[in-house]
Amino acid sequence: VWVSGELSSFKEGEDFYWFGTNTATRDRNFVIYSYPYTAYDTFTKEYFTHKRDSVMRVNIPGAREGMYMETDTLMTKVKGLNVQGQYALEARGLWRVKADMMGGPFVSHARVDTVNNRVVVAEVFVYSPDTRKRDLIRQMEASLYTLRLPGEKATQANDSIK
């Protein structure tokens, strides 16, 4: 996967990686995490948001106890799409921090790593109060399409991105 060099902060958790700019404005973030693939219902909105919320609660806590990132389920849409010739669930919506006034847009791609029988989720989200976020999230979203799972070949265009 290609991640912008501007994302200079890094955190590692259990089956979880976060890269971000860690700034108060125009904050851009990329996360990738995985969990066992057990059934097709993994690709429903309900399962996806439940799993996303549990992973983010552990790995992206708020400033105080009881604060954590969660999905605004009313403002989140999911759909299937084809990425690298394989099915992917795309989730596009809003996140917020429980018990705080933070939030913003996110885009996630969930795919099955058939070699390791795991669901791999790559996600981008931004926090940029009082500014338009469309261009920020679109720039970040492009990195989701550069993810190559085990057994997938990189395309020519992406071979030059290192």
Q: Where would I find each of the regions flagged by the language model?
A:
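A short, polar/proline- and glycine-enriched secondary-structure boundary/capping micro-motif
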Residues: 28-31, 42, 101-102, 132-136
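Surface-exposed amphipathic alpha-helical segments
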Residues: 7, 119-162
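Secretory pathway targeting signatures of secreted, lumenal, and periplasmic proteins
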Residues: 6-61
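Signature of long, low-cysteine stretches enriched in small and polar/charged residues
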Residues: 60-116, 131, 145
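Short, flexible beta-strand-to-coil junctions
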Residues: 23-24, 35-39, 95-97, 124-130
